[in-house]
């Protein structure tokens, strides 16, 4: 397969390395911040992989959709406009797969957290919170992965109704609020943890990324899956769609 990469930052470079090391795929083009994105730049590619920033993603999306090439998006920070993006994808008859984190390990972790949140739901003595750590260059917080985890916890545990991203000096956390804490430190690739606490014990479920290679490899695998699916079932997909089919 031939891939066009949009974004030449740390993740874009890691994706290019994974493709080069595969022995069976190739990078058709790498488009960076200085490239004027037009639909013709994607012709001859089987899939687009986008790792940019929110503003660049929105600016480039019309051209990517018009190209008709399946799009895998790892750019985060636009969850508030997801409904709008889904409509654009549908109207264009395009295929787009979005994930805040393409790591297989992270996605196994998220499913474990969701199951733990479900299991403790009937037992009021257990409380749950979530925390994430990333390098100081990461622009958005909480991370997209943390927000995804929060959605999964809320859907699995009816005792938690809303997410609190930052605590204030004059307000206590309500029992039905889920705290999602963020820490920016050094060059941390990414660490996510769910904390479950009672008077008797504490359960901690964590995932720590050792490098960006897992994220990049997952993005490439998702792009291969999306390219195959695009011919018969275009649409808006998530990593869950890919994994549900893979794990079945």
Curated annotation (Swiss-Prot):
Q: Name one GO cellular component term.
A: cytosol
Binding residues for (S)-2,3,4,5-tetrahydrodipicolinate, per the UniProt record? 135, 144-145
Pathway(s) the chain acts in: Amino-acid biosynthesis; L-lysine biosynthesis via DAP pathway; (S)-tetrahydrodipicolinate from L-aspartate: step 4/4
A Gene Ontology BP annotation from the UniProt entry? lysine biosynthetic process via diaminopimelate
Q: Name one GO molecular function term.
A: NADP binding
A Pfam short name? DapB_N
Q: Which InterPro entries match?
A: DapB_C (IPR022663), DapB_N (IPR000846), DHDPR_bac (IPR023940), NAD(P)-bd_dom_sf (IPR036291)
Ligand binding (NAD(+))? 32, 74-76, 99-102
Per UniProt, the enzyme's principal EC class comes to oxidoreductase
As for subcellular location, the record says: Cytoplasm
* Keywords assigned by UniProt, alphabetized: Amino-acid biosynthesis, Cytoplasm, Diaminopimelate biosynthesis, Lysine biosynthesis, NAD, NADP, Oxidoreductase
- Where, by residue number, is the active site? 134, 138
Catalytic activity of the protein? (S)-2,3,4,5-tetrahydrodipicolinate + NAD(+) + H2O = (2S,4S)-4-hydroxy-2,3,4,5-tetrahydrodipicolinate + NADH + H(+); (S)-2,3,4,5-tetrahydrodipicolinate + NADP(+) + H2O = (2S,4S)-4-hydroxy-2,3,4,5-tetrahydrodipicolinate + NADPH + H(+)
Recorded hits in PANTHER family, A to Z, give:
4-HYDROXY-TETRAHYDRODIPICOLINATE REDUCTASE 1, CHLOROPLASTIC-RELATED, DIHYDRODIPICOLINATE REDUCTASE
Q: What does this protein do?
A: Catalyzes the conversion of 4-hydroxy-tetrahydrodipicolinate (HTPA) to tetrahydrodipicolinate.
Which family does the similarity line name? Answer: Belongs to the DapB family.
UniProt-recorded name of the protein: 4-hydroxy-tetrahydrodipicolinate reductase
Q: Tell me which species this is from.
A: Pelodictyon phaeoclathratiforme (strain DSM 5477 / BU-1)
């Amino acid at each position: 397969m031939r891939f066009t990469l949009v974004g030449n930052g740390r993740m874009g470079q890691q994706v290019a390395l994974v493709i080069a090391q595969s022995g069976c795929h190739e990078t058709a083009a790498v488009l960076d911040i200085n490239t004027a994105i037009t639909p013709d730049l994607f012709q001859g590619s089987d899939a687009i992989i986008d790792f940019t920033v929110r503003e660049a993603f929105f600016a480039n999306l019309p051209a990517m959709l018009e190209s008709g090439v399946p799009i895998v998006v790892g750019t985060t920070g636009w969850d508030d406009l997801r409904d709008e993006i889904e409509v654009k994808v549908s109207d264009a008859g395009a295929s787009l797969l979005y994930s805040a984190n393409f790591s297989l390990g992270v996605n196994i972790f998220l499913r474990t957290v969701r199951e733990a949140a479900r299991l403790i739901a009937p037992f009021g003595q257990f409380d749950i919170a979530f925390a994430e750590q990333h390098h100081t260059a990461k622009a958005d917080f909480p991370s997209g992965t943390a927000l995804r985890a929060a959605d999964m916890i809320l859907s699995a545990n009816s005792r938690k109704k809303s997410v609190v991203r930052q605590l204030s000096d004059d307000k206590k956390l309500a029992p039905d609020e889920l705290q999602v804490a963020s820490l920016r430190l050094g060059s941390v690739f990414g660490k996510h943890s769910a904390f479950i606490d009672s008077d008797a014990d504490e359960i901690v479920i964590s995932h720590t990324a050792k490098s960006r290679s897992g994220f990049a490899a997952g993005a490439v695998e998702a792009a291969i899956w999306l390219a195959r699916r695009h011919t018969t079932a275009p649409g808006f997909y998530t990593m869950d769609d890919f994994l549900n089919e893979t794990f079945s």
